[in-house]
UniProtKB/Swiss-Prot annotation:
Key words of the record: Cell membrane, Membrane, Phosphate transport, Symport, Transmembrane, Transmembrane helix, Transport
Protein role: Sodium-phosphate symporter which preferentially transports the monovalent form of phosphate with a stoichiometry of two sodium ions per phosphate ion.
Organism, scientific name: Xenopus tropicalis (Western clawed frog)
Listed name of the protein: Sodium-dependent phosphate transporter 1
GO BP terms in the entry: phosphate ion transport
Origin: domain of life: Eukaryota
Biased composition annotated in UniProt, kind: Basic and acidic residues: 496-513
Catalytic activity: 2 Na(+)(out) + phosphate(out) = 2 Na(+)(in) + phosphate(in)
Comp. bias (Acidic residues): 482-492
Assigned GO CC terms: plasma membrane
Molecular functions per Gene Ontology: sodium:phosphate symporter activity
Pfam families: PHO4
Lineage: Eukaryota, Metazoa, Chordata, Craniata, Vertebrata
Amino acid sequence: MESTTAFSEVTSALGIENVKIMEPFLWMLVLGFVIAFVLAFSVGANDVANSFGTAVGSGVVTLRQACILASIFETVGSVLLGAKVSETIRKGLIDVNTYNTTQELLMAGSISAMFGSAVWQLAASFLKLPISGTHCIVGATIGFSLVAKGQQAIQWYELLRIVLSWFISPLLSGIMSALLFYFVRMFILRKADPVPNGLRALPIFYACTIGVNLFSIMYSGAPLLGFDKIPLWGIILISVGCAVLCALVVWFFVCPRMKRKIECEFKSSPSESPLMDKKNRELRCPILKPDPEDIKLPVDGGIVAEVKVPILDMVSVSRTEERTVTFKMGDCDDAVEKEKLNSMETNIDQPMNGSVQLPNGNHVQFSQTVSNQMNSSGQYQYHTVHKDSGLYKDLLHKLHLAKVGDCMGDSGDKPLRRNNSYTSYTMAICGMPLDSLRNRDAEARPDEAEKFTVHGADGKKRIRMDSYTSYCNAVADPQMDVEAEEQEEGSIEDVATDRKSSSSSLEERHDQDKPEVSLLFQFLQILTACFGSFAHGGNDVSNAIGPLVALYLVYESGDVTTKAATPIWLLLYGGVGICIGLWVWGRRVIQTMGKDLTPITPSSGFSIELASALTVVIASNVGLPISTTHCKVGSVVSVGWLRSKKAVDWRLFRNIFLAWFVTVPISGLISAAIMAVFKYAILKK
């Protein structure tokens, strides 16, 4: 008798007796592990977009780089910060004491909750809708508990908090993100030279990023790192100290290096000629030679004509098969008035000694090969001055017809073609027709030539024009204005459409960050995304394996109220499933968060990341219900609306909000259906 009692005590201490009791339910444990992996996969496919969606959308990182970084930080965060996941299901939403004598029902409920949450998250990922994984698992838990024990086991106050979070999370985070981006735009982006203010604000941005994210991670109280033993004042002191130290390092080391890099890469760029100093112009652009003396060009019969160039003398190197233009320029503001001449008729079919004097006083000298190709047939071609060329701002100040490689320092630059906007604009100013060149190119490429011609009512072919070609036409031939007016009268709707699209393009381009501003915010956005991914791995791994932890601990101990620590390998199991889901299907929701909802820039992306993280920290301490997904979506929409009211896809936002609204009911219904099958068909309770 004593030996039997001693054996029972030993087996009870080792947990062998409990294992034997729960052994008939081993199949439920195996099924739970399979479904938990699917749930982790769905969390990775949907929720991870919260961290790196804006970084991918702004172009700071590629999708592959985002997946690599997220895999590292999600896994590390899930292992180091996710040790509290066993409390999520067992003590958060339901009263586990009601399952003391029916452990198998709690195990079946955990499987049902994971299945319901996984199905709805996968469906949302397929629809490219970001939803809250926490709300999914909460709805599924409520669903199975209603079937198993009725209303007595549910804490309805938690459901009320979730409903409030639908409105509090996006609204609060959106306001904070909009305020932060408003100050960034006012004091940095809208300045003529945003670099000085950006460098001054850089230490503050880094300090806030480090401080907010460190506090968020330490306040989670991860027992594996000992954060649960640090008091609140200690967490605040450590966070502030690290933030100040980071600010000093950035101010004394990062800012000077960043300033030199910006000056080297952007300030001396030949495409931004107003920013070039005299030395850079002479070194990078040898064909642009300022000369205070007059330029003398040979005209007919060896006569030398003097042309004064008050702004900048343009001398191009004489080479075979190249065209050389030297002209007289005045102030760009009244250039149109100066070039209104009585007659624009010029015969350039018979140039004398390879040069000609144009009606506006300009002298054009070109090789014999080019002059032979200039056969006027009464048809002109002009090309739009493209806004992206980098020459738009100073196009009226400089003029040359050499190759781009002569002016651009990079070896990979392409030479100018005849249909290049810079060349065509130059020809328009000089009054040189390009009809023969166009005809020759049309014979070689008839399909492309047809794109640039329109047929008028009189049967004549006219070159398609838009608002940017009007100046070229006015300078080259006043008669072209008449044809342009006739075309405008005949196609008012087309002109209005082009003008609308042009204004939209200008507005969108105006909202883009300058290259030097992007450089300032790029690493900041990557840093905030990595911190967010690390915290996400510790927080949302509970959504993936919280029910699995409850299932495993109940099977192992036979007690629903066990206080056993969460095994590390279970956390790693959930982290691996999250990463696989991100790699396989994460791009869908990332596209919604980073591109489809509204365009993202590095500056706006940083504002979204930092403000949403700050919102989560503040709301958690105050006790307000919050959702990281809802915070991020609210920040994206508010910043996008502040940048441009037309930039937000409001239909997509409506669909996302509807998905939030139905998340709890749908996941709860699916979980309740599975639980009903377990209870009445399998367990027969």
